[in-house]
A protein has these predicted regions:
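Positively charged n-region of N-terminal signal peptides that target proteins for export
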Residues: 1-4
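C-terminal motif of bacterial Sec signal peptides marking the signal peptidase cleavage site
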Residues: 15-18
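Tryptophan-anchored aromatic micro-motifs
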Residues: 23-38
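Short beta-strand segments that buttress and anchor functional surface loops
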Residues: 29-32, 49-50, 75-81, 101
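N-terminal glycine/threonine-rich, aromatic-flanked beta-hairpin/loop signature
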Residues: 35-75
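A structural detector for short beta-strand units
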Residues: 37-39, 58-60, 84-88, 110-113
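Edge beta-strand at a domain terminus
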Residues: 58-66, 102-126
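Structured, soluble extracytoplasmic/luminal domains of envelope-associated proteins
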Residues: 78-106
Length: 126
């Protein structure tokens, strides 16, 4: 019985850790929307904050629900507490400091960079 309890506890721990966000996208990002609006996004393990250029912040709870790697391009799926889903996509296999946040239909919402505010076109520059 003791072995079963320890095994179940270990499995539960792995599941709970698996729901928190990846180290790849945790931390601060400079984000630009399709209209050129500038935002600061900060990802923590289980929530993220979006701050607009006037300083207004909104905080969202999320869980990471998928990781997909295709042709060395990594996409993380996250689901917000209210049920909405988003993808955090890093289209350049050798550069995880530039990316896109897309809605459930794959439409880009923000371009993200660790250093600068960038446009959509900048993500795909060679």
């Amino acid at each position: 019985m003791k072995k079963i309890s320890i095994t179940l506890l270990a499995i539960l721990s792995v599941i709970l850790v698996g729901c928190s966000g990846s180290d790849t996208y945790r931390g601060s990002w400079k984000a630009t929307d399709s209209k050129g609006g500038k935002f600061e996004i900060f990802f923590d393990a289980k929530n993220f904050t979006v701050k607009n250029s006037s300083g207004k912040s909104e905080k969202y709870d999320y869980t990471q629900n998928s990781v997909e790697i295709e042709n060395s391009v990594t996409t993380y799926g996250i689901q917000l507490g209210d049920g909405r889903g988003y993808q955090i996509n890093f289209p350049n296999a050798d550069n995880e400091t530039l990316g896109l946040i897309k809605d459930e239909n794959g439409n880009p919402i923000y371009t993200i960079s660790r250093k600068d505010y960038i446009k959509y076109e900048d993500v795909y520059k060679l």
